[in-house]
């Protein structure tokens, strides 16, 4: 997942830490949401421009890397609005995984040693950032099933079972 940030940093010459700071988060301003929506147009801003290290340009460099990766080989890209960036590629399979909040909270508690309240806050914060980021760059709702080829509730699945189900779906979908 972080590999895309490193590759975008290499391609742009922008410090990888800046990509990390903007990773699926938007900087807030009072006019956020009013002035801009869906600024992704596929290009990148040159270094001499004052917006070279803007969030939008950081996103555009990541999008450029995502497109290059998809052109070179089969790959799995998690998040980063890749479904939207690659929307015109007929070979892209867009997957969405979800689970009830109580299951997500339990998982975050176990993985991070957090209390229930801390886990809930973390999930709410991250989901809010991701939803805003996705809406800003795509103009779409992150949780809208129409944006994906396959949506799956992973509640009662082990990782092994999830891999099996997804692999089977991909084989059927590609026929």
Regions found by a protein language model. Name each.
Residues 1-5:
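A short beta-strand-loop structural module common to alpha/beta enzyme folds
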Residues 7-74:
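ATP-dependent small-molecule kinase phosphotransfer cores
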Residues 24-37, 115-159:
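Small-molecule kinase domains that catalyze NTP-dependent phosphoryl transfer to phosphate-bearing small molecules
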Residues 63, 159-167:
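Short, amphipathic alpha-helical "lid/cap" segments that border enzyme active or binding sites
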Residues 69-72, 81-88:
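RNA pseudouridine synthases
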Residues 88-110, 116-124:
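Conserved phosphate-donor/acceptor-positioning beta-strand/loop module used by diverse small-molecule
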Residues 168-175:
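Short, charged, intrinsically disordered terminal tails
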């Amino acid at each position: 997942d972080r590999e895309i940030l490193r590759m975008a940093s290499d391609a742009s010459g922008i410090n990888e830490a800046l990509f990390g700071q903007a990773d699926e988060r938007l900087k807030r301003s009072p006019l956020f949401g009013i002035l801009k929506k869906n600024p992704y147009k596929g290009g990148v801003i040159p270094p001499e421009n004052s917006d070279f290290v803007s969030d939008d340009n950081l996103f555009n460099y990541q999008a450029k890397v995502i497109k290059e990766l998809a052109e070179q080989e089969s790959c799995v890209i998690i998040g980063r609005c890749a479904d939207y960036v690659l929307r015109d590629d007929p070979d892209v399979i867009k997957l969405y995984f979800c689970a009830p909040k109580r299951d997500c909270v339990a998982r975050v508690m176990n993985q991070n040693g957090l209390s229930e309240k801390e886990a809930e806050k973390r999930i709410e914060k991250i989901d809010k950032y991701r939803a805003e980021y996705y809406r800003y760059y795509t103009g779409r709702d992150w949780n809208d099933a129409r944006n994906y080829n396959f949506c799956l509730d992973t509640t009662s699945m082990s990782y092994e079972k999830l891999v099996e189900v997804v692999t089977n779906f991909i084989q059927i979908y590609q026929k």
